Amino acid sequence: EYEFINTRDQIPIYVAANAPKAMMLAGELGDGWVTSRTNTVEGFQDAWQQVAKGVEKAGKDSSGLDRVLFSTACLLGPNEGLDSERVKTQAGPWATVALHSLYETVKDPDAAPAPIRPTFAKYKAFMDQRLQSKDDYYFDLHDGHCLYVRDEEAQFVTPEVIGTTTMTAQPDALLE
């Protein structure tokens, strides 16, 4: 009666999904897809193929499905590299989120993106040892998620991990 809530207009539903079955459901049921799965064009296109299967199953037009990619970006200064302390501070928290996600979903270091396989293998061994006796491992694994890099994880925030898991580059390169 007072119209505090709009119940007449359709509200789009965005579905957050990073795993293949969930991405298919996002395409089937959602009006939009939200992911943090990848920072490469190829990876995003691969992930989109899973979403598209759900879109097709629902008989929808894929051009009407919005796509949202959560990531972090860090613009490199002139002559600045991926190993600078400023870059590690800004991009590191997101880079460790990628390691956390790989640890939970990929398990096999050989299945990780090629540039970070050696670092991920070390990270996996580190976390296997750290979490072996914890029932609530996910609290420890995801501590600092997107906010800060834990001291003990700083060794894994390498230029390769930053370059592979974040949108960190010179401004012109990010425009591409």
Predicted segments with their positions:
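Short, acidic/polar
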Residues: 16-25, 167-175
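Short, well-ordered coil/turn segments that N-cap beta-strands
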Residues: 6-12, 30-31, 60-65
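Glycine-enriched alpha-helix->loop->beta-strand junction motifs that scaffold or abut catalytic
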Residues: 25-34
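Hydrophobic faces of well-ordered beta-strands that scaffold small-molecule active sites
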Residues: 13-16, 33-35, 65-72
